[in-house]
Amino acid sequence: MLKKTLILLLVIAVCIPSLSQMMISHPWQGRRVAYFGDSITDPRNSGSKKKYWNFLQEWLGITPYVYGVSGRQWNDIPHQADKLQKEHGDDFDAIMIFIGTNDFNAAVPVGEWYTESDERVLAAVHEPKAIVTRKKRTFIYTDSTFCGRINKAMALLKKRWPKKQIVLLTPIHRAYFYGGEKNIQPTEEYQNKAGEYFDKYVEKVKEAGNIWAVPVIDVNATSGLFPLFDESAVNYHDPDTDRLHPNDLGHQRLARTLEYQLLSLPCVF
């Protein structure tokens, strides 16, 4: 009897991992994903041979539609969306947006999400209906501020593809970058020309999730990429001149983080 029990337990131990793999299917497996962004997404950027979306393509079979362009800021998202629509229409599953670090570097003012005004509106709360005066928030759509740019982009995407999943990624930590005598970017320890620290822009992307009802993956926190220390610069293109762009190792780490974070999000509805 003991021998049979041991054999049964051994069979169960061998089969459980296989059964769990069969039962758990990644929701982004085999999907078609459009990637909007900047140089970290741009396949032409020389900081790495493989980007995070290349790894996701290998691991999950995702078909990537890549529109990220080096140097771009949030005000370029509508242009990238237009290219996606022209090339694929509605024939894709989700959009991932990974942008914002260049807005910080360009010292784009952070701005506000809304204006407020006193407006007259019909209301009834356990009493007869009446026209009352209340504060009203109105979205600010402008290219002159970071929040206004996000509002413009998200309004366009929400109206154009209301059924699609849209995922925002926060910008990741950044350190020294030398791209020539007219392109020297200090570490995030310094404010930009607008007097703002980098994390203010990260926080605004996180706020956008609640404002626009889209999931945000905080890769600034979860990826572990931290180029400010020499010991961590192993994940970046060049420890001496480029701690802005992850290298292959950094992109792999970023992609692995996304692989697991995306397990909790539907790709299609």
Features from the language model and the residues they span:
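Positively charged n-region of N-terminal signal peptides that target proteins for export
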Residues: 1-5
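A generic structural signal for short, solvent-exposed coil/turn residues
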Residues: 6, 25-27, 56-58, 158, ...
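A periodicity- and composition-biased signal for non-globular, repetitive helical segments
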Residues: 9-10, 78, 155
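Hydrophobic core
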Residues: 10, 14-18
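Hydrophobic alpha-helical membrane context
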Residues: 15-16, 50, 115
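Serine-esterase "nucleophile elbow" of acetyl-processing enzymes
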Residues: 20-70, 75-90, 95, 230-232
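Alpha-helical cap/lid subdomain in secreted, periplasmic
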Residues: 59, 81-269
